[in-house]
Amino acid sequence: MKENNYLELIKNANVYAVAKKSSLDHAVLISSKLNNTVLLKREDKQRTFSFKVRGAFNKINQLSTKELENGVICSSAGNHAQGVALASKINKNSAKVVMPITSPSIKIDAVKSLGAEVILHGDNYDEAFTKAKEIEKKESSVFIHPFDDPYVIAGQGTIAKEIIEEFEGDLDAIFVPIGGGGLISGIASYVKESGKNIKIIGVEPEDSASMKLALKAGKPVTLDHVGIFADGVAVRKVGEETFNLCKKYVDDIITVNTDEICAAIQSIYEDTRSIVEPAGALSVAGINQYVLKNNESGKTFVGINCGANVNFDRLRHIAERSAVGKKSEVLLAVEINEEPGSFKKFCESIGKRNITEFNYRYSDKASARVFVGISLDGRSDDKKNIISQIKDSGYIVYDLSDNEMAKLHVRHMVGGRTSIVGEHIFRFEFPERPGALLDFLNSIGQDWNISLFHYRNHGSDFGRILAGIQADPEQMNLLNEHLAQLGYRYWEETSNKAYSMFLG
């Protein structure tokens, strides 16, 4: 299929039997804060709370009766699965959906409620995809690709058509989340082939920037690791077709971190009173970063709110991280003298500021350590001023605002330091499913003494553990070999300042 057919494919796409023309809402608070007009394309309002139903239905609608005799099959952890299930229900064809075992129950139940058969297999999308392709071959069903298909791309492209038709003024840029590239390929194709002078800017998480890496390499490449916080865009390798379209039409791709995504979720909530999923907040996170880095003002930007399928129990983690992402909170570790009145004196050095978190623990006869969170007033130099103010009062201060171990674990563990010979600290990620914690402990084995352990379920696809393991110097090679064989992603954090100050 020729690339120049996409404009017509999008114009002729059949999506409105299952999708609605989502609203283009003015984000008043975000616009005011950024001194630009920001419009939100509310795909989170679709029946399945995601744009994915557009492409799924358009693809299925192109299939003949004979092709649909054995039904359709797809692999997905959530949004595409619901799109295929709903499209199949409307089209009255059978559907099977292979989902990872780690998929949230809310998404599994949603797919089942739409009449599709759910097959749980594997710990991640790649394993589910392999299983789906096996079933496709065995049963002669039709595989509905989540992004690398012309009709799927065209279905997603109808979003751009709606934006152009609804907004009568000049648009400067459309910010689009990128996973496999289907959404941005459709939007970019329609905008550019229509001759519109509108920038198309993709937004990816820093830890799953598969399209940015592909464009840099000149071809789709496979990521060694995919971050799973923004699970809706956690794709290890982009498609061939989507890569070609992005290479031709996309003006820029920027990446954002977890804290920026959480801050964007909060910003969208404050403007709309709606909670989007992490992937759904990517575009706003991108707009915020783009405006601040380029000092933009007076422009008009559109952000695609691509989905709202977020587990309720993830909101605690999102709320904790959003303050740092919005630069509205600083996390500090402070050493103070251990003497009568020193704690009160330290509090006075902070002044009349809003304290968001305060953990204090006796360390030894000479000193104590404080883990403190302090609200910022929004000025770019406020964090610097706070740190200088505390240092000027004679305290040693360490900024932990960007310290992943401190934010995930240590803030919940402040309770006293101890000296354990040969203790080494490691941070682990493992697929979150029933029994996963016990599986992790069994895999560590009984040959190593665990001296510290902290696990917290963030309501995501992966669990996170901080563990202390004792090993003599001559045992370190053996320990590293053992950990490498476990198959879990891990980082050594023994030299992390948060550990040495509060736990080590």
Task: Show where each model-derived region lies.
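PLP-dependent amino-acid enzyme catalytic core
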Residues: M1-A436, F440-G504
